[in-house]
Amino acid sequence: MFTIYTYLAPIVAMVLVVLNYLISNNNSYIEKDGPFECGFTSYQQTRSAFSVAFILVAILFLPFDLEMSSILPYVVSAYSNGTYGLSILVIFLLSLVIAFVYEINLGALNLERRYTPIVKPLMNKLYL
């Protein structure tokens, strides 16, 4: 039975792809190849730099998300792990808390910072 499905599934998929190609309408014109941005055509550069705070939050999300997936096996088998498993979990969580407190003390999570270019004082000196 499995071999029938193994041979039948690719055949059905190919038949559906060929039918889609034969039956579908293909209206290709220049507007389909152009950029679409919120319903209007952009006439200037619309790319702006990402906020550093956004990237910082995204990067800091990864270790704490991995922390949750690392805790899950302990939660599932908490009764069979005993004291040894609990001590390993506490050491793991303690190391993450220490790292988080260190980041706070460094000011890495201060999202109110604004980027000030280094060139600005130089430009003031050149124009004055």
Curated annotation (Swiss-Prot):
Bilayer topology term: Multi-pass membrane protein
Catalytic reaction list: a ubiquinone + NADH + 5 H(+)(in) = a ubiquinol + NAD(+) + 4 H(+)(out)
Pfam families: Oxidored_q4 (PF00507)
Transmembrane parts of this sequence: 3-23, 52-72, 84-104
Subcellular location(s) of the protein: Mitochondrion membrane
GO cellular component: mitochondrial membrane; NADH dehydrogenase complex
Ranges in coiled-coil conformation: none
Known function: Core subunit of the mitochondrial membrane respiratory chain NADH dehydrogenase (Complex I) that is believed to belong to the minimal assembly required for catalysis. Complex I functions in the transfer of electrons from NADH to the respiratory chain. The immediate electron acceptor for the enzyme is believed to be ubiquinone.
Family per similarity comment: Belongs to the complex I subunit 3 family.
Protein name, entry field: NADH-ubiquinone oxidoreductase chain 3
Organism: Debaryomyces hansenii (strain ATCC 36239 / CBS 767 / BCRC 21394 / JCM 1990 / NBRC 0083 / IGC 2968) (Yeast)
